[in-house]
Amino acid sequence: HIVLFKLKDEVSAEEKLVVMNKFKEAIEALPAKIAVIRKVEVGLNMNPGETWNIALYSEFDTLEDVKYYATHPDHVAAGRILAETKESRACVDYEL
């Protein structure tokens, strides 16, 4: 499960950094709350010239686990952190 987020251009660099760090902290706390998460990493793009601001990488045993995670209230709450600043999102789910 790989997700990229782009924040709105009109959001200041300072506000982006605050929101990105809050999101990272919230997502990285999820494995303690959602047992189906095998691994999660959130990378913050420090290169302002690039399109995507946040990269989220996570591992699950099954696609059903991904679906469970996607609708879990703690995950939904973490996603709300980006609600006002997110411009776009790209997601890829694949099996190994």
Regions found by a protein language model. Name each.
Residues 1-7, 41-70:
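Short, well-ordered beta-strand segments in beta-rich or mixed alpha/beta enzyme
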Residues 9-17:
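N-terminal presequence-like segments and adjacent domain-start helices
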Residues 17, 24-37, 59-92:
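An amphipathic, aromatic/His-enriched active-site/gating alpha helix that lines ligand/cofactor pockets
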